[in-house]
Amino acid sequence: MHIEELMWKTIEPKDLWILDKLILSRYLGYKCGPAGTNVPYSGEYIVRPCVNAFGMGLDAKKIFLEKSTDHLQPGTFWCEWFEGKHLSVDYEWGKQILCVEGFKKDSTFVKWDKWVKVFDRMPLPDILKKHFYHQRWINCEFIGNNLIEVHFRYNTDFQWNNNEYIPVWTKDVTVPAGYRYVDDPEPVAGRVGALIK
């Protein structure tokens, strides 16, 4: 069973709101709304599913919106565009234990080039301290200092005590010196494994 599927099967119904990225964005005060509501000003926005058990940025798009969003897919939402580092941070009982930075081309939200351990410190957001102190594992994704996504799990890409994780999208891979290949398939996104060191 996929780790996200297990989370969805075991989460308390009262906690489901945190997994809805539109509701989370509204709680955090971001400029956002569901498909079918007007944006406050013309510009670049991120448009993605409100809920996505697959994760991995599936169906996320950067779109220039004038005003109306009636043309967007139902079940998606728009949110102001953030700039900055993309960090994935693990907390165990509220204490940060891992921070990794993701690197990718601007043309994709799914096929990341690599993730690298970094030493950034990101305090657990107050909204999570208040409502989810009872969760052992919390994984947060940030762009800049902006919380964009929450999972009740840890980052399995670093389960091998590695410092770097390079997703592999094809079986034909040459393993560079200093790396080793691990099978780590993600069928929905098409990942077959990773190079780690």
Regions found by a protein language model. Give the residues of each.
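ATP-dependent carboxylate activation and anion-phosphoryl transfer catalytic cores
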Residues: 54-56, 105-197
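Active-site nucleotide/adenylate-binding loops and adjacent lid/helix of ATP-dependent enzymes
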Residues: 2-127, 170
